[in-house]
Structure formats: structure tokens, C-alpha cells
Amino acid sequence: MYSTSWCGYCARARRLLQSKGADLEEIDLDMVANARTEMVARSNRRTVPQIFIGERHVGGSDELLELEAAGQLDSLLDGPPPQ
């Protein structure tokens, strides 16, 4: 998740993902050189948070909450079934 320490939407997304036991890797745009450039290249968006589950771009906080409301977030976090 690309984020900043002062972003309320980032905090909301972080809390939800932590409550799900997700292995959360945060990239703070204020602390990591070139992180914003990388985020925009990967997501084509300039706002934070930008959330990826694996390599899949989920979107921002609103999209994450929509996935949770639709009952789809847990299966995304669990990953694909073993083959």
C-alpha cells in the first residue's frame, strides 16, 4: 500500500487490512525516494492510498471498503486456491 503518515484514508485502509490479518507492506511517499513516481506508474493515480493485493491494483480506500462490503476482500487476501 502506498500511503503517507498523515492521510486519514490511509489510516482507515491500514486498520481494515490489519483487522483482516493481512501481511501489509506500506510504502510511505514522504519517506521513500521516487515512491510517488513508482505509485503513479503502477496505478495511474496520484492520490493515496493506492492499494495492491499481490500484483492486483485494488484502488484506494473507497474501493477497498466496497470490496469488504461486497464480501470479496477476504478471498482476495487469501489468494488463489492451491492447484
Write out the residue ranges for each language-model feature:
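Local sequence-structure signature of Cys/Sec-based thiol-disulfide redox active-site neighborhoods
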Residues: 1-23
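Residues that form or flank phosphate/diphosphate-binding pockets in enzymes
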Residues: 8-11, 34, 59
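Short, glycine/charged-enriched secondary-structure capping and boundary segments
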Residues: 15-17, 40-41, 66-67
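Structural alpha/beta surface segment adjacent to cysteine/selenocysteine redox centers
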Residues: 20-23, 36-48, 52-58, 62
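Thioredoxin-like thiol-disulfide oxidoreductase module
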Residues: 29-46, 72-83
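Non-catalytic, surface beta->alpha helical segment in thiol-disulfide oxidoreductase systems
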Residues: 53-82
